[in-house]
Amino acid sequence: KAAGQTTGLISSIEVSQGKNKTSVPTADLNPPWLAEQLTSMALAHCENAVIEVPSIALARRCLAGVELDVAILTNIRENHLDFHGSEANYQRAKLRLLDKLKPTGLAIINADDPKTHFLLNQIDRPVLTVGIKQEADITAKPIDCSAGEQTFVITAGSDSIPVRTTIIGDQHIYNCLAATAVGLAQGIEIETIAK
């Protein structure tokens, strides 16, 4: 918003075409439904679309026909093993996200997650790393955490900026780092991203 761009969202919590929001989970993500949502976003003049893609949707190839400008791998955990059958199948499903990148696409990888960190030498696209504990292109240093908010400093190169958020936890910090990486890749100033 602060950058003057309209962004559509498809997540496990909501779907929005910029301003119109509905509660629709992504568990049943399928190519026709996704095409309909992306068309609605285009008609609503969204310049960007953020799509949360669960491993089950990746295994079912629900991004068929979609090429991504940016793919973010925040972590690879042992989730949905009842569906995938094994950790290896789960990891293969998650890695399909990188296969959806355009030739000029950007991969954003969590340097703190050992199961995503090993990918760095295997990705044939530009990569930005994010992290709290390990060395990364974009880092966060937690400063304070209380019951109602947390504060941390995001550093990208020589630029640092404090961020305060009412959503608590490291996972949210990783999400903020990933969003910062996307914004910087689009040429948005870090001060604008922090808003």
Describe every region a protein language model picked out.
Residues 56-64:
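Conserved helix/coil segment N-terminal to the catalytic DExD/H
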Residues 54-57, 113-114:
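Short beta->alpha connector loops
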Residues 44-47, 68-195:
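Acidic, Mg2+-coordinating active-site environments of NTP-dependent enzymes
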Residues 4-20, 53-54:
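Short beta-strand-centered segment that lines the nucleotide-binding/catalytic pocket of NTP-utilizing
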Residues 23-54:
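Conserved nucleotide-sensing/catalytic segment adjacent to the nucleotide-binding pocket
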Residues 35-39, 60, 95:
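Short hydrophobic/charged patches on amphipathic alpha-helices used for structural packing
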Residues 20-31, 79-88:
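Flexible beta-alpha connector loops of hexameric P-loop NTPases
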